[in-house]
Amino acid sequence: MSSTAVVHDDDLMEPSLQSIVNQKTLRWIFVGGKGGVGKTTTSCSLAIQLAKVRKSVLLISTDPAHNLSDAFGQKFGKEARLVDGFTNLSAMEIDPNGSIQDLLASGDAQQDDPMAGLGVNNMMQDLAFSIPGVDEAMSFAEVLKQVKSLSYEVIVFDTAPTGHTLRFLQFPTVLEKALAKLSQLSSQFGPMLNSILGARGGLPGGQNLDELLQKMESLRETISEVNSQFKDADLTTFVCVCIAEFLSLYETERMIQELTSYSIDTHAIVVNQLLFPKDGSECDQCNARRKMQKKYLEQIEELYEDFNVVRMPLLVEEVRGKEKLEKFSDMLVHPYVPPN
Protein backbone atom coordinates (compact mmCIF):
# COMPACT_ATOMS: atom_id res chain seq x y z
CA MET A 1 0.00 0.00 0.00
CA SER A 2 2.98 2.27 0.56
CA SER A 3 5.57 3.02 -2.07
CA THR A 4 9.02 1.54 -1.62
CA ALA A 5 10.79 3.01 1.38
CA VAL A 6 14.39 2.72 2.46
CA VAL A 7 13.96 1.01 5.81
CA HIS A 8 15.59 -2.00 7.37
CA ASP A 9 13.55 -5.19 7.60
CA ASP A 10 13.95 -5.17 11.37
CA ASP A 11 12.33 -1.72 11.51
CA LEU A 12 9.44 -2.46 9.15
CA MET A 13 6.91 -3.51 11.78
CA GLU A 14 8.40 -1.54 14.67
CA PRO A 15 5.67 0.62 16.28
CA SER A 16 7.84 3.75 16.22
CA LEU A 17 9.27 6.40 13.90
CA GLN A 18 12.84 5.27 14.59
CA SER A 19 13.26 4.05 11.00
CA ILE A 20 12.48 7.56 9.71
CA VAL A 21 14.92 9.13 12.16
CA ASN A 22 17.55 6.59 11.08
CA GLN A 23 17.03 7.17 7.35
CA LYS A 24 19.79 9.72 6.76
CA THR A 25 18.90 10.17 3.07
CA LEU A 26 15.56 11.82 3.86
CA ARG A 27 15.38 15.51 2.90
CA TRP A 28 11.61 16.14 3.07
CA ILE A 29 9.21 14.80 5.72
CA PHE A 30 5.52 15.72 5.60
CA VAL A 31 3.27 15.29 8.64
CA GLY A 32 -0.45 15.45 7.91
CA GLY A 33 -3.95 14.28 8.71
CA LYS A 34 -7.44 15.38 9.67
CA GLY A 35 -7.79 18.53 11.76
CA GLY A 36 -7.42 18.16 15.52
CA VAL A 37 -5.55 14.84 15.58
CA GLY A 38 -2.21 16.17 16.83
CA LYS A 39 -0.28 16.94 13.62
CA THR A 40 1.59 19.89 15.09
CA THR A 41 2.58 18.05 18.26
CA THR A 42 3.77 15.11 16.17
CA SER A 43 5.70 17.24 13.66
CA CYS A 44 7.39 19.26 16.42
CA SER A 45 8.30 16.08 18.27
CA LEU A 46 9.65 14.40 15.15
CA ALA A 47 11.74 17.48 14.38
CA ILE A 48 13.18 17.32 17.92
CA GLN A 49 14.22 13.70 17.38
CA LEU A 50 15.76 14.53 14.00
CA ALA A 51 17.73 17.38 15.57
CA LYS A 52 19.53 14.79 17.71
CA VAL A 53 21.01 13.06 14.65
CA ARG A 54 21.02 15.70 11.87
CA LYS A 55 23.20 18.78 11.44
CA SER A 56 20.29 21.12 10.71
CA VAL A 57 16.51 20.72 10.75
CA LEU A 58 13.87 23.15 9.49
CA LEU A 59 10.27 22.83 10.69
CA ILE A 60 7.73 24.58 8.45
CA SER A 61 4.04 25.15 9.16
CA THR A 62 1.84 25.45 6.08
CA ASP A 63 -1.32 25.37 8.22
CA PRO A 64 -3.09 28.76 8.37
CA ALA A 65 -3.77 28.08 12.06
CA HIS A 66 -0.02 28.33 12.74
CA ASN A 67 0.28 26.27 15.89
CA LEU A 68 4.08 26.06 15.96
CA SER A 69 4.31 29.28 17.95
CA ASP A 70 1.80 27.93 20.47
CA ALA A 71 3.51 24.55 20.70
CA PHE A 72 6.96 25.97 21.46
CA GLY A 73 5.75 29.09 23.27
CA GLN A 74 7.79 31.20 20.86
CA LYS A 75 6.72 33.49 18.02
CA PHE A 76 7.66 32.34 14.51
CA GLY A 77 7.11 34.11 11.20
CA LYS A 78 7.81 33.71 7.50
CA GLU A 79 11.57 33.81 8.07
CA ALA A 80 13.25 30.79 9.65
CA ARG A 81 14.55 31.30 13.18
CA LEU A 82 16.14 29.01 15.75
CA VAL A 83 13.86 27.33 18.26
CA ASP A 84 14.79 28.37 21.80
CA GLY A 85 16.99 25.77 23.45
CA PHE A 86 18.27 24.30 20.16
CA THR A 87 21.29 25.10 18.02
CA ASN A 88 20.28 23.13 14.92
CA LEU A 89 16.46 23.26 14.86
CA SER A 90 14.75 26.21 13.16
CA ALA A 91 11.08 26.90 12.48
CA MET A 92 8.96 29.14 10.29
CA GLU A 93 5.26 29.72 9.67
CA ILE A 94 4.08 30.46 6.14
CA ASP A 95 0.82 32.26 5.44
CA PRO A 96 -0.80 30.43 2.51
CA ASN A 97 -3.32 33.26 2.23
CA GLY A 98 -0.62 35.85 1.69
CA SER A 99 -0.77 38.32 -1.15
CA ILE A 100 -0.14 36.94 -4.62
CA GLN A 101 2.24 39.84 -5.08
CA ASP A 102 4.60 38.11 -2.65
CA LEU A 103 4.92 35.27 -5.14
CA LEU A 104 4.89 37.36 -8.30
CA ALA A 105 6.68 40.30 -6.73
CA SER A 106 7.95 43.14 -8.83
CA GLY A 107 11.00 45.04 -7.96
CA ASP A 108 14.63 45.11 -7.31
CA ALA A 109 15.32 41.72 -5.69
CA GLN A 110 18.41 39.70 -6.48
CA GLN A 111 18.77 38.78 -10.11
CA ASP A 112 19.88 35.22 -9.35
CA ASP A 113 16.80 34.46 -7.24
CA PRO A 114 14.13 32.76 -9.37
CA MET A 115 11.51 34.03 -6.93
CA ALA A 116 12.60 37.63 -7.28
CA GLY A 117 11.57 40.29 -9.70
CA LEU A 118 8.52 38.59 -11.15
CA GLY A 119 6.69 41.88 -11.73
CA VAL A 120 3.24 41.56 -13.21
CA ASN A 121 0.49 43.84 -14.36
CA ASN A 122 -3.20 43.21 -13.74
CA MET A 123 -3.43 40.79 -16.64
CA MET A 124 -0.68 38.60 -15.21
CA GLN A 125 -2.20 38.78 -11.73
CA ASP A 126 -5.55 37.64 -13.11
CA LEU A 127 -3.78 34.71 -14.76
CA ALA A 128 -2.00 33.84 -11.52
CA PHE A 129 -5.24 33.91 -9.53
CA SER A 130 -6.83 31.56 -12.05
CA ILE A 131 -4.33 28.81 -11.16
CA PRO A 132 -5.97 26.25 -8.84
CA GLY A 133 -4.27 26.09 -5.45
CA VAL A 134 -2.62 29.50 -5.72
CA ASP A 135 -2.75 29.92 -1.93
CA GLU A 136 -0.69 26.76 -1.56
CA ALA A 137 1.60 28.21 -4.22
CA MET A 138 2.50 30.92 -1.74
CA SER A 139 3.64 28.27 0.71
CA PHE A 140 5.55 26.44 -1.97
CA ALA A 141 7.27 29.64 -3.07
CA GLU A 142 8.50 30.29 0.46
CA VAL A 143 9.78 26.73 0.70
CA LEU A 144 11.76 27.17 -2.51
CA LYS A 145 13.53 30.17 -1.05
CA GLN A 146 14.81 27.93 1.73
CA VAL A 147 15.66 25.16 -0.71
CA LYS A 148 17.84 27.44 -2.81
CA SER A 149 19.94 28.29 0.22
CA LEU A 150 20.73 24.59 0.78
CA SER A 151 21.26 25.34 4.46
CA TYR A 152 19.05 22.64 5.98
CA GLU A 153 19.76 18.94 5.94
CA VAL A 154 16.14 17.90 6.48
CA ILE A 155 12.85 19.81 6.28
CA VAL A 156 9.72 18.79 8.23
CA PHE A 157 6.33 20.12 7.10
CA ASP A 158 3.53 20.62 9.60
CA THR A 159 0.80 20.63 6.98
CA ALA A 160 -2.72 21.99 6.77
CA PRO A 161 -5.70 19.62 7.28
CA THR A 162 -5.95 16.75 4.81
CA GLY A 163 -7.57 18.36 1.76
CA HIS A 164 -5.23 21.36 1.76
CA THR A 165 -2.24 19.09 2.25
CA LEU A 166 -2.95 17.12 -0.88
CA ARG A 167 -3.52 20.24 -2.98
CA PHE A 168 -0.20 21.56 -1.75
CA LEU A 169 1.54 18.41 -2.91
CA GLN A 170 -0.19 18.60 -6.28
CA PHE A 171 0.80 22.19 -6.87
CA PRO A 172 4.12 21.58 -8.68
CA THR A 173 2.26 19.70 -11.41
CA VAL A 174 -0.45 22.38 -11.58
CA LEU A 175 2.10 25.17 -11.92
CA GLU A 176 4.10 23.32 -14.54
CA LYS A 177 0.96 23.03 -16.68
CA ALA A 178 0.05 26.69 -16.14
CA LEU A 179 3.52 27.91 -17.08
CA ALA A 180 3.58 25.65 -20.12
CA LYS A 181 0.31 27.24 -21.24
CA LEU A 182 1.69 30.72 -20.61
CA SER A 183 4.79 29.92 -22.64
CA GLN A 184 2.60 28.67 -25.48
CA LEU A 185 0.57 31.89 -25.44
CA SER A 186 3.77 33.91 -25.41
CA SER A 187 5.11 32.15 -28.47
CA GLN A 188 1.85 32.83 -30.30
CA PHE A 189 1.06 36.34 -29.10
CA GLY A 190 4.33 37.53 -27.55
CA PRO A 191 5.07 40.36 -30.03
CA MET A 192 1.53 41.69 -29.74
CA LEU A 193 1.59 41.53 -25.92
CA ASN A 194 4.98 43.22 -25.77
CA SER A 195 3.61 45.96 -28.00
CA ILE A 196 0.60 46.45 -25.72
CA LEU A 197 2.72 46.35 -22.58
CA GLY A 198 5.18 48.75 -24.15
CA ALA A 199 2.42 51.25 -24.81
CA ARG A 200 1.38 50.96 -21.15
CA GLY A 201 4.89 51.42 -19.85
CA GLY A 202 5.81 47.76 -19.67
CA LEU A 203 5.73 45.47 -16.67
CA PRO A 204 6.63 46.76 -13.21
CA GLY A 205 10.40 46.89 -12.86
CA GLY A 206 10.81 47.73 -16.55
CA GLN A 207 10.75 44.11 -17.69
CA ASN A 208 9.38 42.90 -20.96
CA LEU A 209 7.32 39.74 -21.34
CA ASP A 210 10.27 37.60 -22.43
CA GLU A 211 12.25 38.51 -19.30
CA LEU A 212 9.25 37.68 -17.13
CA LEU A 213 8.83 34.32 -18.83
CA GLN A 214 12.52 33.52 -18.37
CA LYS A 215 12.24 34.12 -14.64
CA MET A 216 9.04 32.10 -14.43
CA GLU A 217 10.71 29.29 -16.38
CA SER A 218 13.59 29.34 -13.90
CA LEU A 219 11.02 28.99 -11.12
CA ARG A 220 9.32 26.16 -12.99
CA GLU A 221 12.63 24.29 -13.27
CA THR A 222 13.23 24.64 -9.55
CA ILE A 223 9.72 23.43 -8.74
CA SER A 224 10.12 20.52 -11.15
CA GLU A 225 13.36 19.52 -9.42
CA VAL A 226 11.74 19.60 -5.99
CA ASN A 227 8.70 17.74 -7.29
CA SER A 228 10.93 14.91 -8.50
CA GLN A 229 12.49 14.77 -5.03
CA PHE A 230 9.03 14.44 -3.49
CA LYS A 231 8.51 11.28 -5.55
CA ASP A 232 11.82 9.74 -4.46
CA ALA A 233 11.38 7.46 -1.43
CA ASP A 234 15.05 7.96 -0.58
CA LEU A 235 14.41 11.68 -0.12
CA THR A 236 10.77 12.09 0.91
CA THR A 237 8.21 10.42 3.14
CA PHE A 238 4.79 11.32 4.54
CA VAL A 239 3.82 10.56 8.15
CA CYS A 240 0.06 10.18 8.61
CA VAL A 241 -1.44 11.25 11.93
CA CYS A 242 -4.88 10.11 13.07
CA ILE A 243 -6.99 9.12 16.04
CA ALA A 244 -8.83 5.82 16.48
CA GLU A 245 -12.20 7.00 15.19
CA PHE A 246 -14.12 6.29 11.99
CA LEU A 247 -13.82 9.69 10.27
CA SER A 248 -10.11 9.98 11.02
CA LEU A 249 -9.47 6.46 9.75
CA TYR A 250 -11.48 7.23 6.59
CA GLU A 251 -9.48 10.42 5.96
CA THR A 252 -6.22 8.54 6.52
CA GLU A 253 -7.14 5.86 4.00
CA ARG A 254 -8.15 8.47 1.43
CA MET A 255 -4.93 10.38 1.98
CA ILE A 256 -2.73 7.29 1.68
CA GLN A 257 -4.42 6.28 -1.57
CA GLU A 258 -3.90 9.73 -3.04
CA LEU A 259 -0.30 9.95 -1.86
CA THR A 260 0.37 6.60 -3.47
CA SER A 261 -1.23 7.80 -6.72
CA TYR A 262 1.27 10.68 -6.72
CA SER A 263 4.16 8.27 -6.01
CA ILE A 264 4.84 9.86 -2.63
CA ASP A 265 6.16 7.39 -0.07
CA THR A 266 4.21 6.80 3.12
CA HIS A 267 4.90 3.97 5.55
CA ALA A 268 4.21 5.40 9.02
CA ILE A 269 1.03 6.21 10.93
CA VAL A 270 0.87 7.89 14.33
CA VAL A 271 -2.34 7.11 16.24
CA ASN A 272 -2.83 9.75 18.92
CA GLN A 273 -5.07 10.16 21.98
CA LEU A 274 -5.37 6.48 22.88
CA LEU A 275 -6.90 5.57 26.25
CA PHE A 276 -5.41 2.82 28.39
CA PRO A 277 -7.74 2.32 31.39
CA LYS A 278 -6.32 0.26 34.21
CA ASP A 279 -7.68 -3.23 34.74
CA GLY A 280 -10.81 -3.05 36.85
CA SER A 281 -11.39 0.62 36.08
CA GLU A 282 -14.90 1.76 37.03
CA CYS A 283 -14.90 4.64 34.53
CA ASP A 284 -17.66 3.51 32.18
CA GLN A 285 -16.95 6.28 29.69
CA CYS A 286 -13.24 5.43 29.62
CA ASN A 287 -13.92 1.73 29.11
CA ALA A 288 -16.49 2.37 26.37
CA ARG A 289 -14.18 4.72 24.53
CA ARG A 290 -11.26 2.32 24.85
CA LYS A 291 -13.45 -0.45 23.39
CA MET A 292 -14.26 1.77 20.39
CA GLN A 293 -10.62 2.80 19.96
CA LYS A 294 -9.47 -0.80 20.14
CA LYS A 295 -11.83 -1.71 17.28
CA TYR A 296 -10.47 1.01 14.99
CA LEU A 297 -6.88 0.41 16.07
CA GLU A 298 -7.24 -3.23 15.04
CA GLN A 299 -8.57 -2.09 11.66
CA ILE A 300 -5.60 0.25 11.23
CA GLU A 301 -3.14 -2.52 12.02
CA GLU A 302 -4.91 -4.89 9.65
CA LEU A 303 -5.12 -2.38 6.78
CA TYR A 304 -1.54 -1.16 7.20
CA GLU A 305 0.35 -4.26 8.23
CA ASP A 306 3.42 -3.05 6.30
CA PHE A 307 3.41 0.34 8.08
CA ASN A 308 5.09 1.54 11.25
CA VAL A 309 1.99 2.16 13.42
CA VAL A 310 2.85 4.27 16.47
CA ARG A 311 0.41 4.19 19.40
CA MET A 312 0.42 7.40 21.46
CA PRO A 313 -1.51 7.82 24.72
CA LEU A 314 -3.99 10.54 25.60
CA LEU A 315 -2.14 12.73 28.10
CA VAL A 316 -3.60 14.57 31.06
CA GLU A 317 -1.91 17.84 30.07
CA GLU A 318 -1.46 19.76 26.83
CA VAL A 319 1.85 19.10 25.10
CA ARG A 320 3.23 22.64 24.99
CA GLY A 321 6.74 23.89 25.60
CA LYS A 322 10.15 22.37 24.96
CA GLU A 323 10.21 19.95 27.91
CA LYS A 324 6.78 18.41 27.27
CA LEU A 325 7.48 18.15 23.54
CA GLU A 326 10.75 16.36 24.27
CA LYS A 327 8.95 13.85 26.50
CA PHE A 328 6.29 13.31 23.84
CA SER A 329 8.96 12.93 21.17
CA ASP A 330 10.62 10.12 23.11
CA MET A 331 7.43 8.08 22.73
CA LEU A 332 7.68 8.39 18.93
CA VAL A 333 10.90 6.37 18.97
CA HIS A 334 10.45 4.35 22.17
CA PRO A 335 7.02 2.64 22.05
CA TYR A 336 4.72 3.63 24.89
CA VAL A 337 4.08 0.91 27.46
CA PRO A 338 0.86 1.50 29.42
CA PRO A 339 1.03 1.01 33.20
CA ASN A 340 -0.52 -2.12 34.66
Swiss-Prot record:
Protein purpose: ATPase required for the post-translational delivery of tail-anchored (TA) proteins to the endoplasmic reticulum. Recognizes and selectively binds the transmembrane domain of TA proteins in the cytosol. This complex then targets to the endoplasmic reticulum by membrane-bound receptors, where the tail-anchored protein is released for insertion. This process is regulated by ATP binding and hydrolysis. ATP binding drives the homodimer towards the closed dimer state, facilitating recognition of newly synthesized TA membrane proteins. ATP hydrolysis is required for insertion.
Lineage, broadest ranks: Eukaryota, Fungi, Dikarya, Ascomycota, Pezizomycotina
SUPFAM superfamilies: P-loop containing nucleoside triphosphate hydrolases
Protein keywords: ATP-binding, Cytoplasm, Endoplasmic reticulum, Hydrolase, Metal-binding, Nucleotide-binding, Transport, Zinc
Top-level taxon of origin: Eukaryota
Native organism: Aspergillus terreus (strain NIH 2624 / FGSC A1156)
Gene Ontology MF term list: ATP binding; ATP hydrolysis activity; guanyl-nucleotide exchange factor activity; identical protein binding; metal ion binding; protein folding chaperone; unfolded protein binding
Oligomer status and interactors: Homodimer.
Positions bound to ATP: K34, G35, G36, V37, G38, K39, T40, T41, E245, N272
Record: active site: D63
One annotated GO biological process: response to heat
InterPro entries attached to this UniProt entry: Anion-transp_ATPase-like_dom, ATPase_ArsA/GET3, ATPase_ArsA/GET3_euk, P-loop_NTPase
Locations listed in the record: Cytoplasm; Endoplasmic reticulum
Amino acids binding Zn(2+): C283, C286
Protein name: ATPase get3
A Pfam cross-reference name: ArsA_ATPase
EC number of the protein: 3.6.-.-
Gene, per the UniProt record: get3
Metal-binding in keyword set: yes
Family under the similarity heading: Belongs to the arsA ATPase family.
One GO CC term, this protein: GET complex
